[in-house]
Structures are given as structure tokens and as C-alpha cells.
């Protein structure tokens, strides 16, 4: 096998694993919070922006900010500026956007934060 094939194989395995992990979070939302959570939810009618997770019924979004310690896309200047634009537009559209890290995604604090948001009406 050449290096490119090995690289593609590793990448597809990593993508599959991430997808399975995210499905677990949507199940947690359903069982613990009693709401439908959608992964990769497209919220803007014109832009290709997506939330990592969304609870559309309550207009609550959860963004998982990866690469915090490794200079990932969200922490580099261009990625950060893009996120600012995305989050501001989402807020103007009435969304409440919460941010977390991959490490904190399944923690009780994150689930409790979403629970409080669901039980607290958003005042426009």
C-alpha cells in the first residue's frame, strides 16, 4: 500500500469514529433531555453554515470547538473570524449558541447547561 492509500484509510476511519461519537450525543439529548438533537444542522438559508448540534424546537445550538491545544481551525485567525460571523448571524436569527470542547461534550455540566437553556425562555 502506498502512503496516500494508508492516509485516506486512516482519515475515513477517524471520520467514521467521530460520526459514531456524535450519534451518541444525540441519543443522550433524547434520553436525558427529552428533545430531538440534530447533528450538522444547516441553520442559514443562504450560507452553508452548520451547527455541530442543534435543538431546532428551542433554537439552541451547541458548537464543539476542537483544536484548542493544537492550534486547530477555531483558534487560528481566519477560522476564529469566520466563527464570529457565523455566531453573530445565528444570534440575529434568534438562536442561542453555546460552545464546548470535545472533552466536555458528554460532561454533566454541558447537559445541565442545555437543560437550563431548554427550561429558560429566550427573550428576543
Region annotations inferred by a language model:
Residues 1-124:
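Nucleic-acid endo/exonuclease domains
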Amino acid at each position: 500500500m502506498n502512503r496516500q492509500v494508508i492516509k485516506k484509510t486512516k482519515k475515513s476511519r477517524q471520520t467514521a469514529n467521530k460520526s459514531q461519537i456524535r450519534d451518541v450525543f444525540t441519543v443522550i439529548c433524547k434520553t436525558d433531555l427529552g428533545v430531538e438533537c440534530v447533528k450538522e444542522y444547516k441553520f442559514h438559508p443562504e450560507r452553508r453554515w452548520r451547527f455541530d448540534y442543534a435543538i431546532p424546537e428551542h433554537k439552541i445550538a451547541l458548537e464543539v470547538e476542537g483544536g484548542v491545544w493544537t492550534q486547530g481551525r477555531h483558534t487560528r485567525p481566519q477560522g476564529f473570524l469566520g466563527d464570529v460571523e457565523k455566531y453573530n448571524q445565528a444570534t440575529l436569527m434568534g438562536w442561542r449558541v453555546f460552545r464546548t470542547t470535545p472533552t466536555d461534550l458528554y460532561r454533566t455540566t454541558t447537559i445541565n447547561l442545555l437543560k437550563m437553556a431548554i427550561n429558560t425562555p429566550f427573550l428576543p
